């Protein structure tokens, strides 16, 4: 009897183990790594109603939302004032109307340039020190923005009988002279610039018939710029083969020409550096 009871217990344990293995193989994942021993109970007389499994909702970890931070406030920087070139500081201190210096290699033109913003032709008979002088000095049209600069800067100078001031502009009536001396160096008090001459022509101060080159400062559009350039080239004594394009800054030099009534001789150049 003892042997038979022992055999039954062994058989019961074996059957229990087989049942557990069968349940695990069907996808039921154990809740932990140990298995509670099975306690045999009497079969229930009434059908057991299965209870609903409790589902535990997993709350995802809260991810903090990015916080927008304003960039650090910075003090607004004031625009830096341009520095006057060393070589022109004394001149500008002597007369704040001094705006630069013009030199044309191959000519005697090597003079300061001034501008009176409030009185037209103020320097027609005054030197750069504002002293009375028959020869005057080279001066820019009062409405031109020399430092921006405008699309065109007009500068006037006398044709003196002794060959000074703008008298040498008349040499540009000959193409051979232009070929050897086609560059103008015009420095403002702040910057060095070089211009290339593209047209030289006669005109008149009689506005009813003359080319009003002197009132062209800033082009309202490309057509206006192109018209100015085309007119200069059509009046020119010869073709230089140079046609400035919108965006290229121009300089117009004007002096007297006594070959015609109220005559003017005009040299026009484009900035190349």
Feature annotation, model-predicted:
Residues 31-80:
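Intrinsically disordered, low-complexity serine/threonine-rich repeat tracts
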Residues 22-25:
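C-terminal motif of bacterial Sec signal peptides marking the signal peptidase cleavage site
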Residues 27-29:
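Bacterial signal peptide processing site
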Residues 4-6, 58, 256:
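Generic extreme N-terminus detector
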Residues 61-273:
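Solvent-exposed, non-transmembrane regions of membrane-associated and secreted proteins
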Residues 2-14:
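Bacterial N-terminal signal peptides that target proteins for export
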């Amino acid at each position: 009897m003892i042997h038979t009871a022992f055999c039954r217990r062994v058989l019961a344990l074996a059957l229990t183990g087989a049942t557990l293995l069968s349940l695990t193989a069907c996808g039921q994942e154990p809740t932990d790594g140990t298995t509670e021993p099975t306690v045999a109970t009497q079969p229930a007389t009434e059908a057991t109603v299965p209870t609903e499994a409790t589902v535990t909702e997993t709350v995802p970890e809260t991810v903090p939302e990015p916080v927008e931070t304003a960039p650090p406030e910075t003090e607004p920087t004031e625009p830096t004032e341009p520095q006057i070139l060393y070589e022109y500081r004394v001149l500008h201190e002597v007369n704040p109307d001094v705006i630069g210096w013009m030199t044309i290699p191959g000519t005697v033109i090597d003079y300061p340039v001034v501008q009176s913003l409030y009185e037209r032709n103020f320097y027609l008979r005054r030197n750069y020190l504002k002293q009375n002088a028959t020869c005057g000095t080279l001066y820019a049209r009062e409405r031109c923005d020399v430092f921006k600069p405008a699309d065109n800067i007009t500068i006037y100078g006398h044709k003196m009988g002794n060959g000074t001031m703008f008298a040498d502009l008349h040499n540009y009536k000959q193409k051979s002279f232009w070929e050897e001396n086609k560059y103008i160096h015009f420095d403002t008090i702040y910057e060095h610039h070089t211009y290339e001459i593209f047209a030289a022509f006669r005109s008149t101060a009689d506005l009813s018939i003359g080319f009003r080159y002197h009132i062209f400062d800033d082009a309202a559009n490309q057509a206006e710029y192109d018209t100015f350039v085309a007119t200069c080239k059509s009046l020119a004594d010869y073709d230089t083969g140079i046609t400035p394009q919108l965006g290229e800054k121009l300089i117009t030099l004007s002096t007297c020409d006594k070959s015609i009534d109220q005559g003017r001789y005009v040299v026009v150049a484009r900035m190349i550096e």
